[in-house]
Design a protein with these regions (language model features):
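Vicinal oxygen chelate
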Residues: 5-14, 35, 66-165, 183-211, 250-324, ...
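Surface-exposed interaction/gating patches
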Residues: 151-254, 270
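Short amphipathic beta-strand starts and helix->beta connectors
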Residues: 62-66, 142-146, 212-217
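Short amphipathic alpha-helices in soluble, non-transmembrane regions
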Residues: 25, 61-62, 94-97, 175, ...
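Core segments of cupin and vicinal oxygen chelate
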Residues: 12-55, 99, 107-119, 162-208, ...
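Conserved donor-binding loop and adjoining core beta-sheet/short helix segment
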Residues: 33-38, 48-82
């Protein structure tokens, strides 16, 4: 019963068309599922990932057109990263970001890896991290039809940063699900405590969480450009049910078992209020669509299929068809 690393991140957008264009045409990720938020079917839920949307490669977005801008603060997932294969790939991305007008930093080193910090069009704080020296959870396989050459393509999710007021509480929750402390690095803001690097299972960039203590910030307000939750990988339904018992014994309120069709989940908030999810690796995104046309049409799980007509009527048009 082991957490294996990061499964996916789910963030917020107010512009589903602009989001689709940036993540597919600029970052070169594959849209592997166009579906809806199962808790609010008036909103799209887009999944981007590697060629097949393997667990550990998925960056997802809920679309809420009227949502305000995210306000940075504590109790937030304040930084998300995407893995690329090599230091050479970072050089390619600097040129690509310049070409496409993406706000970005020079290549630098952070927590033992070379990295480029950048923002998406709605201000989400992202980075590209090089897997040049990575040891641990392996990455995925870039889609061969991406506009980005496969040798430079994004291969998965890298370390995430949690910004909190009481780091010991978040660290305790991470330890409960199997994380251990790897290292501490100096704070990015003068006068703040060191950032604690936590890892799980095989470790490496696909299994790392960075806990940033900040005593100088107000609580976050979630909006476009913000991250809603992080999910961690587990093997199957049996393990998920066992984790529900662990959380119950620890006195952590949780959702219990949730059927998401493409995977199974449970949700809980760690003591600083950040939403965590445990999600199974399967069944996967090719359960209801052929591999060749993943993400090209609106996919609905069987328990929403009888509502398709009304759901489609309430969604904004979004053309994601590639095989024309």
């Amino acid at each position: 019963m082991n957490v294996k690393g990061i499964h996916h991140l789910s963030a917020m957008t107010g512009s589903v068309t602009g989001n689709f264009e940036f993540y597919t045409e600029v970052l070169g990720m594959r849209l592997i599922k166009k579906t809806v938020n199962q808790d609010d079917t008036s909103a799209y839920h887009l999944f981007y990932g590697d060629e097949r949307g393997n667990a550990g490669t998925e960056l997802t977005f809920f679309d809420f057109p009227s949502i305000g801008q995210n306000r940075k603060g504590v109790s937030s997932i304040s930084g998300s990263s995407l893995r690329v294969p090599s230091d050479e790939a970072l050089g390619f991305w600097v040129e690509r970001f310049i070409e496409h007008g993406v706000k970005h930093s020079p290549i630098s080193e952070f927590a033992g890896r070379n990295v480029i910090f950048f923002e998406d069009p709605e201000g989400q704080q992202l980075s590209l991290v090089s897997d040049e020296t990575n040891v641990g959870v392996v990455g995925g396989t870039p889609w061969e039809k991406s506009p980005v050459p496969t040798q430079y393509g994004i291969v998965g999710l890298g370390p995430i940063k949690l910004t909190v007021r009481k780091p010991e509480s978040t660290i305790a929750a991470l330890r409960l699900i199997g994380f251990t402390e790897k290292a501490r690095v100096p704070a990015l803001v003068e006068g703040q405590e060191d950032i604690i690097i936590m890892q799980v299972a095989e470790g490496g960039s696909g299994a790392e969480v960075q806990v940033e203590p900040r005593s100088d910030l107000s609580p976050t307000r979630l909006g476009k450009g913000g991250v809603h939750h992080v999910a961690f990988r587990i093997a199957d339904k049996e393990e998920l049910l066992a984790w529900i018992e662990v959380l119950n014994k620890a006195g952590l309120p949780n959702s219990g078992f949730v059927e998401r069709f493409y995977f199974r989940s449970l949700y809980f908030r760690e003591p600083n209020g950040i939403l965590f999810e445990l999600a199974t690796d399967g069944p996967g995104f090719d359960t209801d669509e052929p591999f060749e046309t993943l993400g090209e049409s609106l996919a609905l799980p069987p328990f929403l299929e009888d509502q398709r007509e009304s759901i489609e009527a309430n969604l904004r048009p979004l053309d994601t068809k590639r095989s024309k």
